[in-house]
């Protein structure tokens, strides 16, 4: 039996061991597929990262498919049922690293676009692809750099569909219409090193820090809102001491992270943290890393088209959610684009034996096609 177009594309992509930030020719394959469909191909390489901007059409509105060709490492290959970079179908499931996150989505996008441009060669506006090999890594030279380039030449995205695996039990049951912000603090608290038998001659930074850390951990930062849960503070790493049991440490390192809602800004969080540390009289140094601002796509054409398409293809209603981690949508939303995430079931992402139901990729492609019909075809 001959593979469908979606399955053939997915297998081709999975077979390329594109561990971040290596692309392994995935984007070249995509470019060769899209160019005959009328797409202008623009590779954007920044340092070790390969990016692709492909666009069909010169006018607005711009419907953009966004995603990444890089994958996380496979882990021990011997723990997989099948080799992680040899796409294999077992009982209707396609196994391989990247099957769900997110080469399956990319294959569904490509097949949907081929079908749509064949059926509607004179569609309204433009269709674009923004693809990077740096989503699973440090996300420095990927989507942020492409967006900088587009913004510099005033090239705007109207609607953006990120193919991250958003679904929980079946395709389309959950759509991400926003994400929480992520802010990490690296805190060093200073004391005075000394002998444990002479505590009066030392200052133990661990003892000094505990009350402040307890206040940070127990504080209700906000109540959240109808779209976002309350802001979360979590301590990720703590390090102090020399390893000797008779030495009071001279300093203590604490790393913590905020996942925050639209009820707070990163500036407000920084100010409140500093106030708590200062109130406890600590001597400290604090460095911040902002991974992304929170964003929300409320009611509008993109959300409406997404809900309608899922209902039309699957017969099911969808849940709008902002839960989970960050995605590259956080770099696209600040440009003013409406952004949603819609992809396959995420139960096996980043795991051994990552897999996706083959039928789900076909369903996903049909949903993507339906969305383009709603947004890029004149129905008058």
UniProtKB/Swiss-Prot annotation:
Catalysed reactions, semicolon-separated: N-succinyl-(2S,6S)-2,6-diaminopimelate + H2O = (2S,6S)-2,6-diaminopimelate + succinate
Active site residues according to the UniProt entry: 70, 135 (proton acceptor)
Cofactor: Zn(2+); Co(2+)
GO process annotations (BP): diaminopimelate biosynthetic process; L-arginine biosynthetic process; lysine biosynthetic process via diaminopimelate
Positions of Zn(2+) 1 binding: 68, 101, 164
Pathway(s) the chain acts in: Amino-acid biosynthesis; L-lysine biosynthesis via DAP pathway; LL-2,6-diaminopimelate from (S)-tetrahydrodipicolinate (succinylase route): step 3/3
Record's keyword terms, sorted: Amino-acid biosynthesis, Cobalt, Diaminopimelate biosynthesis, Hydrolase, Lysine biosynthesis, Metal-binding, Zinc
Pfam families assigned: M20_dimer (PF07687), Peptidase_M20 (PF01546)
PROSITE patterns: ARGE_DAPE_CPG2_2
Cofactor stoichiometry and binding remark: Binds 2 Zn(2+) or Co(2+) ions per subunit.
The keyword Cell wall biogenesis/degradation appears for this protein: no
Lineage: superkingdom: Bacteria
Residues in coiled coil: none
Molecular function GO labels: acetylornithine deacetylase activity; cobalt ion binding; succinyl-diaminopimelate desuccinylase activity; zinc ion binding
Residues the entry annotates as binding Zn(2+) 2: 101, 136, 350
EC class name: hydrolase
Keyword Amino-acid biosynthesis belongs to the record: yes
EC number(s) recorded for this UniProt protein: 3.5.1.18
PANTHER family, alphabetized: ACETYLORNITHINE DEACETYLASE, N-ACETYL-L-CITRULLINE DEACETYLASE
Oligomer and partners: Homodimer.
Family classification: Belongs to the peptidase M20A family. DapE subfamily.
Function: Catalyzes the hydrolysis of N-succinyl-L,L-diaminopimelic acid (SDAP), forming succinate and LL-2,6-diaminopimelate (DAP), an intermediate involved in the bacterial biosynthesis of lysine and meso-diaminopimelic acid, an essential component of bacterial cell walls.
Name listed for the protein in its UniProt record: Succinyl-diaminopimelate desuccinylase
Native species: Tolumonas auensis (strain DSM 9187 / NBRC 110442 / TA 4)
Upper lineage: Bacteria, Pseudomonadati, Pseudomonadota, Gammaproteobacteria, Aeromonadales
């Amino acid at each position: 039996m001959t593979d469908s177009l979606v399955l053939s594309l997915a297998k081709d992509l999975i077979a390329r061991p594109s561990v971040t930030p290596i692309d392994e020719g995935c984007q070249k394959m995509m470019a060769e597929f899209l160019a005959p469909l009328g797409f202008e191909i623009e590779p954007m390489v920044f340092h070790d990262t390969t990016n692709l901007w492909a666009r069909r059409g010169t006018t607005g509105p711009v419907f953009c498919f966004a995603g990444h060709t890089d994958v996380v490492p496979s882990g021990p290959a011997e723990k997989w049922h099948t080799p992680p970079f040899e796409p294999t179908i077992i009982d209707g499931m396609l196994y391989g690293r990247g099957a769900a996150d997110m080469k399956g989505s990319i294959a569904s996008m490509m097949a949907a676009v081929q079908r749509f441009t064949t059926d509607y060669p004179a569609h309204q506006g433009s269709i674009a692809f923004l693809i990077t090999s740096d989503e699973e890594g440090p996300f420095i030279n990927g989507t942020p750099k492409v967006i900088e380039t587009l913004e510099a030449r005033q090239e705007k995205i109207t609607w953006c569909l990120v193919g991250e695996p958003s679904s929980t039990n079946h395709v389309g049951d959950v759509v991400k219409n926003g994400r929480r912000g992520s802010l990490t603090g690296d805190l060093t608290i200073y004391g005075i090193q000394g002998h444990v038998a002479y505590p009066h001659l030392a200052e133990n930074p661990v003892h000094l820090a505990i009350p402040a850390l307890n206040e940070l951990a127990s504080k209700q930062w906000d109540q959240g809102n109808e779209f976002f849960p309350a802001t979360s503070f979590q301590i990720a790493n703590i390090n102090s001491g020399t390893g000797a049991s008779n030495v009071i440490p001279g300093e203590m390192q604490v790393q913590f992270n905020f996942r925050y809602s639209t009820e707070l800004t990163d500036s407000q969080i920084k100010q409140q943290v500093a106030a708590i540390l200062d109130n406890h009289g600590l001597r400290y140094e604090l460095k911040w890393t902002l991974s992304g601002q929170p964003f929300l796509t409320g009611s509008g054409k993109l959300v409406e088209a997404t809900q309608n398409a899922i209902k039309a293809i699957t017969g099911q209603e969808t849940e709008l959610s902002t839960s989970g981690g960050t995605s590259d949508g956080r770099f696209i939303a600040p440009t003013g684009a409406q952004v949603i995430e819609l992809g396959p079931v995420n139960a096996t992402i980043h795991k051994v034996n990552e897999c996706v139901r083959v039928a789900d990729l076909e369903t996903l492609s049909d949903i993507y096609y339906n969305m383009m019909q709603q947004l890029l075809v004149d129905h008058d």
